[in-house]
Swiss-Prot record:
GO terms for molecular function: amino acid binding; ornithine carbamoyltransferase activity. Carbamoyl phosphate binds at S47, T48, R49, T50, R98, H125, P126, C127, Q128, C262, L263, R290. Reversibly catalyzes the transfer of the carbamoyl group from carbamoyl phosphate (CP) to the N(epsilon) atom of ornithine (ORN) to produce L-citrulline. GO terms for cellular component: cytoplasm. This is Ornithine carbamoyltransferase. Belongs to the aspartate/ornithine carbamoyltransferase superfamily. OTCase family. Keywords: Amino-acid biosynthesis, Arginine biosynthesis, Cytoplasm, Transferase. One of its GO terms (biological process) is arginine biosynthetic process via ornithine. Its main location: cytoplasm. L-ornithine binds at N156, D221, S225, M226. It comes from Methanococcus aeolicus (strain ATCC BAA-1280 / DSM 17508 / OCM 812 / Nankai-3). It catalyses: carbamoyl phosphate + L-ornithine = L-citrulline + phosphate + H(+). The gene is argF. Pathway: Amino-acid biosynthesis; L-arginine biosynthesis; L-arginine from L-ornithine and carbamoyl phosphate: step 1/3. It comes from the Archaea.
Amino acid sequence: MHLLTLENLERKDIENILNDAIYFKKNRKSENILKEKTVALIFESPSTRTRISFDIAVNELGGHSLTLNTGETHVSKKESTKDTAKVLSRFVDVIVARVKEHSTLEDFTKYGNVPVINALSDLSHPCQILADLLTIKEHKNKLSGLKFAYFGDGNNVCNSLILGCAIMGMDIFVATPEGYEPNEKFVKMAQQIIDKQGEGSITITDDAIICAKDADVLYTDVWVSMSDKNKNIDEVLKIFPPYQINEKLLSYAKKDAIVMHCLPANRGMEITDEVIDGEQSVVYDEAENRLHAQKAVFKYIFSK
């Protein structure tokens, strides 16, 4: 059982994961799901929240974590992913990997024989979205029927958000400049889920106000990630400011709307200090919930 994207999860699966996460949040060291298990944590790019939350999750679940930074090992450098996957499968019980290319994760699942969890790739960020859904549920007491508004680059986080929100029956609005839309495959999958369930909707627009109007949740991410070297920075700084979450944009949303950002944030760019530090911001709850959601993911993986 692997978790590379959310596409193979049904609503009941996510509901179970969120319920388990709520339990783990109330009972920090309650279960030894990973007793006598070793988890390899592989990082091809810098990480704060992902690394710390997974490390703590493994240890609080009774397991042992082994962190492998690619700059210090042969992983993704001098050794093929195929060989790395086969060798690690002899040593560890789970592979958690934060990678630059999603294909690396697919190779781990193809050539290894232990569960693989996507801690972030260029295509998807499923664990972040499970933490996001947990945060929304905590603050709104439901998911189905909410208007979820995303602003900015249609990146890996956006891809996973539209999938997760579609599964949970939410109305998804994505405001992004032309040419920066989310991955078409994920948009199609989200629409198929919506059609099948007969609940929710998805709208991709370049109009931030349409996106923000009467929204229950406003969400943004960095306009340019640390690993994205293909974007024209000057162009980004020119065309993205209308998608900044600021007090004016927030005024179009519902009065009790919450504001989210997966962090790290470039304050003054995709979001202002006033908003991220304001009463409607839940970014630190969101960050904390990475720990609890990821514990629930381990439980889900080993219950299959």
